[in-house]
Curated annotation (Swiss-Prot):
Species the sequence originates in: Borrelia recurrentis (strain A1)
Record's subunit section: Part of the 30S ribosomal subunit.
Pfam families named among the record's database cross-references: Ribosomal_S10 (PF00338)
Keywords: Ribonucleoprotein, Ribosomal protein
Domain of life from the UniProt record: Bacteria
GO process annotations (BP): translation
GO cellular component: ribonucleoprotein complex; ribosome
Function: Involved in the binding of tRNA to the ribosomes.
Organism lineage string: Bacteria, Pseudomonadati, Spirochaetota, Spirochaetia, Spirochaetales
Name this protein carries in UniProt: Small ribosomal subunit protein uS10
Matches recorded under PANTHER family: 30S RIBOSOMAL PROTEIN S10 FAMILY MEMBER (PTHR11700)
GO molecular function, one term: tRNA binding
Amino acid sequence: MITKDKIRVRLFSFDVKILDQSAESIVRAVQKSKTQIKGPIPLPTKIKKYTVLRSPHVNKKSREQFEMRTHKRLIDILEPTSALMDSLMKLELPAGVEVDIKQ
């Protein structure tokens, strides 16, 4: 059964290496089923910065900054089959990678 839609897979992670490994495993699974694919497309990295005081009591000028970087990738799968969807659902991805699938 072939649908005429496309599936958009978005991957989020704090670690770039495991994000790229996950994207490559999805691309390999799609290429095995001989379906067209676009991506992985790197999306802008979201940087969240936190500034805290170093001292609990005095020294207001002494501060420390921390940041969290959220890396994103986008993969479009054109005309997916039901067998491809089953293989994507069974795919083992490393911990720390969030997957968002939309039609």
